A protein has these predicted regions:
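Conserved pre-ATP/AMP-binding loop-to-beta segment of ANL
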Residues: 115-132, 139, 162-168
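Conserved AMP-binding/adenylate-forming core of the ANL superfamily
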Residues: 11-39, 82, 145-148
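Gly/Ser/Thr-rich phosphate-binding loop
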Residues: 215-220, 229-293, 306
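AMP-binding/adenylate-forming catalytic core of the ANL superfamily
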Residues: 47, 331, 337, 358-435, ...
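Conserved AMP-binding A3 loop
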Residues: 23-24, 127-155
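Conserved AMP-binding/adenylation subdomain of ANL enzymes
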Residues: 151-168, 178-217, 302-304
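Conserved ATP/PPi-binding loop(s) of AMP-dependent carboxylate-activating enzymes
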Residues: 300-304, 315-348, 386
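Conserved AMP-binding/adenylate-forming
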Residues: 20, 33-75, 172, 385
Length: 464
């Protein structure tokens, strides 16, 4: 698997469910069954991913056989899925299926490997993984990643998290999501164990498995941590827990500090991290020793990576502290490039290991980096440039449950609270905005993707 020899961990426990336990030897044996029915020439294989052992086995088999894997959400709308299939014309589709399709060439448990296209597809020899840039929208735009990208990011993450064969993680993030895949990669690479469950963190069954199998590591996006507070996580007795990580968006710094303080008190290492699919997964991390005094920071570059800030207009590197610019990243984990068509899968990298993140950032006097917003998360209200992330974070710091979006001349605030006039007055007083430029709407449930990221485009529709 991307040049990591899983055979060295043959006797280690690899995958655990409520019904089964697979050693690494079992996983290798199962994956070889799939490898043997696939052609030797590199194939494009679409995975309709679910949180189960079958998805993991199929994925490992395809990587070991040097094929290209397109990871998609199994619950993706059929019309959107059809668009992707028509665009990329994959050789095979691997999915959960109750009955054999006439084109099924192999079944592993209740999954079918279906031959979809027998034509030869010209693929970049280094292409290993395709991930969507758009969550569940079904856009054909994909991030393309090489084995070298996967290996580099895996090595960096295992180094700073100090993952070992003694670790045991539980699935919380989908496998079509770069963060979820990185958790899988890093633990397999070290011969660690993975408890595989489809249960949500708000489910009693999830925590029953967590305790029964003595899970050491928890990973989550901001949504997960907000849910943990609601289910009274701080009152739980979890003696096996040693490491917690957070990525997938900015965690409210008040919540981050609460978890940092709890973690310190319970001898748990809590890592706040930052990444993008375009960099395979991880770009920066906040060392756990600083998660209290620098709770708002994304930290420092991952091992073997480099962060810099460039002036938006001149593109010159900004060396001084607290001066805002666009964040750039350099490292071997930077993608091959984007693909929007089958022809794009032949492309070789033109990025030279450099990623323009699209995030506004600054660094402090100690060299720790802070995200201040998105270049595209700005609106102009009566000629005034408004940072939507800044306003959202400001309102959250005042205790309001809000999300912000907008367009030209209108700031839109969705809230789960009832005090709409109070929020409007605060915005008028703080940002000198006219009341006619602000729309505030009560929404019971914020729209999120399966990986817990906010669907701002859908949020905006609520104001139409």
């Amino acid at each position: 698997m991307f040049d990591i020899d899983l055979e060295q961990f043959a006797n280690n426990t690899c995958l655990i469910t409520t019904d089964e336990v697979f050693s690494y030897s079992d996983v290798i044996k199962a994956s070889k069954q799939i490898e043997e029915v696939l052609p030797k020439q590199k194939q494009l294989i679409v995975f309709l991913c679910q949180m189960d052992i079958e998805t993991i086995i199929g994925y490992i088999a395809s990587l070991r056989a040097n094929h290209a894997c397109m990871m998609l959400d199994a619950s993706l709308d059929k019309a959107l899925l059809d668009t992707l299939i028509d665009t990329y014309k994959p050789n095979f589709i691997y999915k959960k299926s109750d009955e054999d399709d006439q084109k099924t060439i192999f079944r592993y448990k209740n999954y079918s490997l279906i031959q979809h296209n027998t034509s030869t597809i010209e693929l970049n020899p280094k292409l290993s993984l395709l991930l969507s840039t758009s969550g569940t929208t079904g856009s054909p735009k994909m991030v393309t990643l090489s084995k070298d990208n996967l290996y580099a990011n895996c090595q960096s993450i295992t180094e700073y998290l100090q993952i070992s064969s003694n670790d045991r993680v539980i699935t919380t993030l989908p496998f079509h999501y770069s963060y979820g895949l990185s958790v899988l990669h890093t633990h397999l690479a070290k011969g660690a164990s993975i408890v595989v469950t489809p249960e949500s963190v708000i489910s009693r069954a999830f925590w029953d498995s967590f305790k029964k199998y003595e899970v050491t590591t928890f990973n989550g996006v901001p949504y997960h941590y907000e849910m943990l507070r609601r289910i009274k996580f701080f009152d739980m007795d979890l003696p096996s827990l040693k490491v917690m990580t957070q990525a997938g968006g900015k965690l409210n710094h008040t919540i981050a500090k609460e978890f940092a303080l709890w973690a310190k008190e319970h001898n748990v290492k809590f890592f706040i991290m930052y990444g993008q699919t375009e960099a395979t997964a991880r770009i920066a991390y906040l060392p756990y020793q600083h998660n209290i005094d620098k709770a708002k920071s994304i930290g420092i570059a991952i091992p073997k990576g480099k962060l810099s800030i460039k002036d938006i207009d001149t593109q010159k590197i900004i060396d001084e502290a607290f001066k805002e610019g666009e964040l750039y990243y350099q490292g071997d984990n930077v993608m091959i490039g984007y693909a929007s068509s089958l022809k794009d899968l032949q492309n070789t990298s033109s990025l030279n290991g450099t990623l323009q993140t699209g995030d506004l950032a600054y660094k402090d006097e100690d060299g720790f980096f802070y995200i201040s917003g998105r270049l595209k998360r700005f609106i102009k209200v009566h000629g005034k440039r408004i940072n939507l992330d800044e306003i959202e974070h400001f309102l959250k710091s005042k205790g309001y449950r809000v999300l912000c979006t907008g367009d030209d001349d209108t700031l839109m605030v969705a809230t789960q609270d009832d005090n709409l006039q109070e929020i409007q007055k605060l915005l008028i007083d703080t940002y000198a905005l006219h009341h006619s430029t602000i729309k505030i709407k009560h929404i019971d449930t914020f729209p999120v993707t399966p990986s817990g990221k906010i669907k701002y485009s859908e949020l905006k529709k609520a104001f139409v």
